[in-house]
A protein has these predicted regions:
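Non-catalytic interface/targeting segments
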Residues: 1-55, 63, 111-128
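Short active-site-adjacent helix-start/loop capping segments
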Residues: 42-44, 76-79, 105
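Short, charged beta->alpha transition segments
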Residues: 53-59, 105-106
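Mid-chain, well-packed structural core segment of small domains
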Residues: 61-97
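Active-site-proximal loop->helix
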Residues: 82, 108-109
């Protein structure tokens, strides 16, 4: 799905997404990402929600956003409290959503000037 937004050079904006890719400022990625408004997207080595560990959130924690939006794939799933305990201890809120809702919510909060992070889990690309 293409989003009709006004991307800026200043902020990292989700400009499109499908089940197996995400587009940030018109650049397509086919791997999981961590996105923050003022930082270039970072590859996130997570390809399966069920394999998440607390360690996977350290890169987000280091950026100290006010809120992490976790895109859990094609359907909404909730992270176990022990996985996000270190984020909560640092007063970083965590919201879990399917990827489409996560992308839309990130854009809205980013446009409002909120210090938000988006972590999107994409499936491993199929190799032939």
């Amino acid at each position: 799905m293409k989003l009709h937004v006004t991307p800026t050079q200043q902020y990292q904006t989700v400009t499109g997404y499908e089940q197996d890719w995400i587009e940030i400022n018109a650049v397509r990625f086919d791997h999981s990402l961590i996105v923050l408004p003022e930082v270039a997207p970072v590859r996130w080595p997570v390809t399966d929600f069920d394999a998440l560990t607390a360690e996977d959130f350290k890169a987000v924690e280091a950026q100290s956003p006010d809120l992490l939006i976790l895109g859990t794939g094609s359907r909404q799933r909730f992270a176990a409290p022990k996985l996000v305990a270190s984020l909560i201890a640092r007063r970083i809120g965590v919201e879990c959503m399917d990827n489409q809702a996560a992308c839309r919510t990130y854009n809205i909060l980013m446009a409002e000037g909120r210090k938000v992070a988006l972590a999107v889990i994409l499936p491993r690309p199929e190799t032939t």
